Structure formats: C-alpha cells, structure tokens
Amino acid sequence: MEAKAIVRYVRIAPRKAQQVVDLVRGKKVDEALAILKYTPKAAAPIVEKLVKSAVANAENNNGMDIDRLYISEIYANQGPTMKRFRPRAMGRATTIRKRTSHIEVVLKEK
C-alpha cells in the first residue's frame, strides 16, 4: 500500500528543490521531518509540508500505520518557466527565468 502527495507549480527552481529532496529519500517519516525542520534552504518548508500532507493521506485515506511509514520515492521535476524582462544599460533588456517545480512524494509501509 502506498500514499502519495504532489505539489505543483511551486515557485522554486527544480535544481534547488532537488538538493533538499535528496536529503530525505529513503528515510523514515519522523526522521525526514526532523531533517527538514533544521535544513536552512528555501525548499525545506515546502517539502516538509508535502511530507506531512502525504502522512495525513496515508492515515486518513488508506488507514496506514504512521510509525511504519518511510519515503520510498520523492522527486522534484521541472514545471513551467515564467519569463520576465529586466531592463539593462543603453535600452537593452535581459530575460529572467523564474523557474517552477512539481514535487511528488510516495510513502510506503515497512
């Protein structure tokens, strides 16, 4: 049995989200939440909220035991990129790419 949670279009670059996601892959849920709580990265609170959502899904929808849950899959994929322009010298402009991510977590029981 597995429980899943997905956050889409979150405003953080996938490369930066991937650093946080790699820290908790394969860990037990309570250990992963402790790691995320003290990780000083912008993606950490987003991933922490996502893991808590997956735990709630496991408990309420599937009736799984919280103490036996671990993160079997977690990944951050690229979402759509918002393109903006920043004015530069001499009437020019450069493109600023505001990247978004889709982060997905799958929990299983041991």
UniProtKB/Swiss-Prot annotation:
GO terms for biological process: translation. The keyword Transcription regulation does not apply. One of its GO terms (molecular function) is rRNA binding. Keywords: Ribonucleoprotein, Ribosomal protein, RNA-binding, rRNA-binding. GO terms for cellular component: cytosolic large ribosomal subunit. The keyword Hydrolase does not apply. Part of the 50S ribosomal subunit. This is Large ribosomal subunit protein uL22. It comes from Alkaliphilus oremlandii (strain OhILAs) (Clostridium oremlandii (strain OhILAs)).
